[in-house]
Design a protein with these regions (language model features):
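C-terminal helical subdomain
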Residues: 176-192, 196-253
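Amphipathic alpha-helical dimer-interface segment in Rossmann-like NAD(P)H-dependent oxidoreductases
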Residues: 74, 78, 113-133
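Conserved NAD(P)H cofactor-binding loop of Rossmann-fold oxidoreductase domains
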Residues: 87-96
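Conserved glycine-rich Rossmann-like NAD(P)H-binding loop of the short-chain dehydrogenase/reductase
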Residues: 30-45
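Catalytic loop of short-chain dehydrogenase/reductase
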Residues: 110, 130-163, 167-168, 172-175
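Conserved glycine-rich cofactor-binding loop
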Residues: 15-16
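Catalytic Tyr-X3-Lys loop
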Residues: 100-119
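Rossmann-fold cofactor-recognition segment
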Residues: 50-67
Length: 256
């Protein structure tokens, strides 16, 4: 049955501000989308937002611990559509405050909340891609806080930097499985309905970020571990997403 159905893209964190842009861009490109989330209300709101899109499906699930991630992966593996790619747009709220004023337990909790869901997802979901004849892409969405410290948001800078290094390690290890794992690093804060009144002109919209993520899935030959996204990507083409067998690539580690 898998051979006659269009492959789908799994979006983690698809109910969040950035994740909604990823979902919108994938649907715009004609791809079936499966969004996993823990909150039934937010999943229902996402369905309402894209009510005219039959390609969107949702699934209740959690990546908060290893056992929950394993159960989720088993359910995804049983779906009739083959899995072509995973886009992880997960991230907690930015906690303002000085790191030197926080306890070690607080920093550990932030690491648990921001990094470990990605680790659980990679461990259990990335292997589902390795035997797939389709795109075999795994994309993590990163923020600019990982490349340089943000004043007043040091905790987020630390956890995001850890995720940035984690993505580079996964990039190397995933190639042995025939999967291309990359981080799409957004170079500025993302303009959302919540912050639009105070947003700077160079901040990309969540839909622009989503379109850039789609470009990494769509026959892209760029195999760098970290690819950057900024407002210069605004003119990306919006054709139908092609999730055919990926081309061979060289191991060219680095960042764009």
């Amino acid at each position: 049955m898998n051979g006659i159905l269009t492959p789908e893209v799994l979006v983690l964190g698809g109910t969040g501000a950035v994740g909604q842009g990823v979902v919108g861009a994938l649907l715009e490109a004609g791809s079936p989308v499966l969004v996993v989330g823990r909150d039934p209300g937010r999943l229902a709101a996402l369905h309402e937002q894209f009510a005219d899109e039959p390609g969107l499906q949702t699934m209740l699930g959690s990546l908060s611990d290893d056992g929950s991630a394993k159960v989720l992966a088993e359910r995804v593996a049983q779906r009739p559509r083959p899995l072509a790619a995973v886009v992880a747009a997960m991230g907690g709220p930015y906690n303002r405050g000085r790191v030197i004023d926080r306890s070690g337990d607080a920093l550990l909790g932030a690491m648990q909340a921001d990094l470990m869901p990605h680790a659980h997802a990679v461990r259990h979901l990335l292997p589902l891609l390795q035997d797939n004849p389709h795109a075999r892409r795994y994309v993590m969405i990163g923020s600019p806080a990982g490349a340089k410290p943000w004043a007043g948001y040091g905790e987020t800078s630390i956890t995001t930097a850890a995720l940035r290094m984690y993505a580079q390690v996964v990039h190397q290890e995933a190639q042995a499985l025939g999967v291309r794992a990359q981080m799409l690093e957004v170079c500025s804060p993302v303009c959302t309905p919540a912050n639009a009144a105070n947003a700077c002109i160079e901040w990309p919209s969540s839909l622009l970020v989503g379109r850039r993520a789609v470009s990494l899935l769509d026959g892209c030959r760029d195999n760098r571990a970290i690819v950057r996204c900024d407002n210069s990507d605004a003119e990306l083409p919006r054709g139908l997403l092609n999730l055919d067998l990926p081309p061979l690539w060289r191991d060219t580690a680095g960042v764009a």
